[in-house]
From Swiss-Prot:
Pfam families reported for this sequence: Aminotran_3 (PF00202)
EC category name: isomerase
E.C. no: 5.4.3.8
Lineage: Archaea, Thermoproteota, Thermoprotei, Thermoproteales, Thermoproteaceae
Domain of life of the native organism: Archaea
Residues recorded with modification N6-(pyridoxal phosphate)lysine: 258
Recorded name of the encoding gene: hemL
Protein name: Glutamate-1-semialdehyde 2,1-aminomutase
NCBIfam families: hemL, PRK00062.1
Cofactor: pyridoxal 5'-phosphate
Amino acid sequence: MLFERARQVFPGGVNSPARALKHLPSSLVARAASGPYLYTDRGRLVDYCMAFGAIILGHAHPRVKRAVEEQLERGWIYALLTEQEVEFAEAIRRHMPSVEKMRIVNTGTEATMNAIRLARGYTKRDVIIKFDGNFHGSHDYVLVKAGSGAATWGIPTSAGVPQDVVKLTVVAPYNDVDAFLKAVKEVGDRLAAVIAEPVAGNYGLIIPDAEFLKALREETKRVGALLIFDEVITGFRLGLGGAQGRFGIRPDLTTLGKAVGGGFPIGIFGGRAEVMDLVAPSGPVYNAGTYNAHPVSVTAGLAVLKELETGEPFRTADEAAERLAKGIEDIAGRLGFDVVVKKIASMFQFYFKKGDVKTPQDVRESNEKMYLKLHEIALRHGVYLTPSQFEVNFTSAAHTREVVEETLAALEKAFQQLKTEIG
C-alpha cells in the first residue's frame, strides 16, 4: 500500500498535514487530474478542494498546459530577468492598483513572511496584529492561533516557535471591531502592521462585515502602521481585483499565491512603491531566492490571467458555487439537518449547526464529526469535498451545470446515508 510506504519516509505519510485526511485510514493517492475531476486510488472524483484553491480554470487547463510546454522548450530556469515576469507583474498591477511594485517568490508562506519583515523595516516597529483563525503560512511570525491544517490537527500554535517571537504577535478576534480597536490601543506605538485575510478562508469560510475591514484600514492609517491583506486565497478568485476590489479597501501591502500561479508554486508580496523600494537591492530589507519568479510559474500565471480577463471563468465558477450552496441547503433542510451554508464568488462551505457563522468561534461550535462523516460518505459517491470544516470548497471554470447536477445527485445520496447511519 502506497500510504504505508509513504509513512516510512514522510512524517505522517504526507508532505503537508491537510493531505493526511485524519478521519480516514489513509490519504488519497492521486493518479491524474483533468477539468473538474481527480483520478485517484478511489476512482474518479468531482473535485471541490481544487488543490486548496490553487486551481480556478480547472485541472490541466489546455491554455496553461500549452504555455508551460512552450516555456519548457526554451528552458526552465535562468536566474535572470525574463519578459514573462515583467508582463505578469504588469497584468497584476493593472487589476490590483494597490500593488504598485512587487516581488515574486515561491509560496504564500514566503510572501507573508517577507511582507511582515518589510512592514517592520518600513515602520521601524516590531509588533504585528493577526486574527484568530486566519492562516498566513507556516513561518514563526504567524503560527499563533492559526487556521487551516493547524486548526484541523488541533495545533494552532506550533511547538518550536520561540516565546520571544510569539510576544511580538498579538492575536485579536476576527470580525470584531471593538476587540481590534482595543488590541491596537494596547500595542500602542510598537505596532508595525496588521495582517488579515479580507475573507477568512482558512477557518472554514467567514465573510467579514464591511465595517470590520473599514476599521482595519482607518485605524492602521491613524496609528502609522501598515495594513497587509493576505489574498493568497482570494486574489484572482473573488474577481480580478480580489477581495480588496470587491470591498473597496486599499491595503498598503498585499500577498498573493494559489490561483494566480495556475497550480504552480508561486507567492507574491507587493504594495505601495515607497514601501516596496525598501526591498533589496534597492533597499535594506533583504529577500532573495534562486527560484523567485520561476519562468514556468510566471508563464502559467500569465496564461491564467489572460483567461480570467475574459470574465467567463469567473461567471462559470461563481454560478457553480451558487447552485451548489443552494442545493446543499435544500437537501439538508429536506432531510432535517441543521446546516449553515456560506458562499462568496467561487468559494463555499457548510456547517452542521444552527445560527450564522461570522467568527471562528461559530465554526468551532459546529459539528465537525458530522462534516467528516459526510465527507467520507461523499467520497464513496464520487465527490471530493474539502477534507475539513476548517477549509473551504472551491469551484472552477470546469464545474459546468452538468457537473454540478452530478454532484448534487451524489450529495443527496450521501446526506440520506448520513441520516440512516446516525439514526
